[in-house]
UniProtKB/Swiss-Prot annotation:
This is Ubiquinone biosynthesis O-methyltransferase. One of its GO terms (molecular function) is 2-polyprenyl-6-hydroxyphenol methylase activity. O-methyltransferase that catalyzes the 2 O-methylation steps in the ubiquinone biosynthetic pathway. S-adenosyl-L-methionine binds at R44, G64, D85, M129. It holds the Pfam family Methyltransf_23. It catalyses: a 3-demethylubiquinol + S-adenosyl-L-methionine = a ubiquinol + S-adenosyl-L-homocysteine + H(+); a 3-(all-trans-polyprenyl)benzene-1,2-diol + S-adenosyl-L-methionine = a 2-methoxy-6-(all-trans-polyprenyl)phenol + S-adenosyl-L-homocysteine + H(+). The keyword Transferase applies. It comes from Serratia proteamaculans (strain 568).
Amino acid sequence: MNAESSSQAQNVDHHEIAKFEAVASRWWDLEGEFKPLHRINPLRLNYILQRAGGIFDKTVLDVGCGGGILAESMAREGAQVTGLDMGAEPLQVARLHALESGVNVAYIQETVESHAQANPQRYDVVTCMEMLEHVPDPASVVRACAHLVKPGGHVFFSTINRNTKAWLMAVVGAEYILKMVPQGTHDHKKFIRPSELIGWVDGTPLREKHMIGLHYNPITDHFKLGRNVDVNYMVHTQHEG
């Protein structure tokens, strides 16, 4: 392994890993710290299903799978799902929950860069949700995802925009006022503008096909998808190699 590939294989922020390991046991508590993920998961899943033309019997990789919320839901749609994460505790929770639920998901503790080196063009669909803002080099993750998907396959990213509105809503509002997620979950400096993400995508065989925002209304306590990408957003890309 050369210096570049070694660096890519260690694209890990151990402080970020520790944050999620500390609360891993409550990953499937529908009223706990991960309640927002449980609530937005149907929106994310439906978006993936619609844009990818369904995932039944397709090979799917969930990068940064955590405790397996999205991975399990995709497996229930008939996909052959692999979940990738660097947190040992979240993966253990994911494996136990899959066993209890009777869902078949292969969970692996490995960086996406390392997985890409061994599995080029292996997957029909790759998802990378709420993960890019938690690693030192998000562009490296985008490149690895592009390497993992088959020509014609689909890659989905979701992250948080970097601007004052996003800081007020995703950090001040969600962490300190509404207490929807633990304080310190997000670092505004690590948020990613859509132009930055698309710039990284354009440096690969992936091409942007669609972008959509994810909105939360604190008055109605309701999540929905919409055109505004000021805060949370998802991007659908396709490998055109």
